[in-house]
């Protein structure tokens, strides 16, 4: 069983990423954890290294992919969102067959996409489901090296700038998957990074994704039980 590296990008309040790091340390104590952030965000104990970059908080998707590229991590890693708690060991044995693994959306994938989400004009996706438009979640991605993120950043910079604020990472994942440039594998979100609604109905996933502000208190409460601290 080999330990895996973890990478996350975050700016602003660090309560949730601190809990993420503690959960990784509980179940993957020997893993390297890389924190990418701006010059204002507080430091986080327990990470292996911190990369501080110039970030545009109005264009978080661009800053995120730029950070993953600038880290230049030339070894396998899981790139993970910060509203997540790891609840069992995640090892490289999960990722032995392919160079890249994407998190496949399954929860509420048939819901119709909101064409004015966060003020974005997504009218080009009218009458399409969220699963059709964004089949992959950007909350949990495995890559063998940083080249994948350089390509994703190039894609994001080539599309409509409205996606630089939101959905840009998912746009890039769909486009790069369709390009067939990489040897891709897929892991269902219910297995690798489930929302609480799924995680309570089946065998425990590897991690729980407390997506959205409404689940922040739930993440804190779960961490208190899981980690024995807030």
Regions found by a protein language model. Give the residues of each.
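GT-A fold catalytic core of metal-dependent nucleotide-sugar glycosyltransferases
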Residues: 52, 61-115
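N-terminal anchoring/stem segment of glycosyltransferases
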Residues: 1-59, 72-73, 147, 179, ...
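Short, polar loop motifs at secondary-structure junctions
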Residues: 35-43, 84-90, 190-193, 212
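Catalytic core and acceptor-binding pocket of nucleotide-sugar-dependent glycosyltransferases
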Residues: 133-219
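A structural signal for short, well-ordered beta-strand segments and their strand-loop junctions
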Residues: 34-36, 78-81, 86, 101-103, ...
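A structural signal for well-ordered alpha-helical segments within the folded catalytic domains
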Residues: 15-18, 62, 66, 167-175
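A short acidic, often aromatic-flanked loop/helix-cap motif at beta-alpha or helix-coil junctions
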Residues: 41-43, 55-61, 108-110, 191-197
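Conserved catalytic core of nucleotide-sugar-dependent glycosyltransferases
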Residues: 94-159
């Amino acid at each position: 069983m080999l330990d895996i590296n973890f990478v996350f990008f975050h700016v602003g309040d660090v309560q949730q990423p601190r809990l993420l790091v503690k959960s990784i340390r509980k179940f993957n104590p020997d893993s390297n954890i890389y924190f990418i952030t701006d010059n204002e965000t507080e430091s986080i104990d327990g990470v292996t290294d911190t990369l501080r970059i110039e970030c545009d908080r109005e264009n978080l998707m661009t800053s995120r992919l730029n950070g993953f590229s600038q880290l230049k991590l030339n070894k396998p890693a899981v790139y993970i969102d910060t509203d997540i708690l790891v609840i069992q060991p995640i090892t490289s044995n999960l990722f032995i067959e392919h160079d890249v693994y994407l998190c496949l959306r399954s929860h509420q994938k048939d819901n119709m996409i909101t064409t004015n989400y966060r003020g974005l004009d997504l009218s080009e996706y009218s009458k399409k489901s969220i699963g059709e438009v964004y089949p992959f979640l950007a909350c949990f991605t495995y890559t063998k090296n940083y080249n994948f993120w350089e390509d994703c950043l190039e894609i994001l910079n080539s599309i409509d700038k409205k996606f630089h604020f939101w959905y840009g990472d998912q746009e890039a994942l769909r486009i790069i998957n369709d390009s067939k440039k990489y040897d891709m594998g897929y892991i269902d979100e219910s297995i690798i990074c489930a929302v609480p609604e799924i995680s309570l109905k089946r065998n425990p996933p590897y991690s729980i994704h407390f997506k959205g502000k409404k689940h922040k208190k739930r993440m804190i409460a779960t961490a208190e039980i899981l980690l024995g601290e807030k």
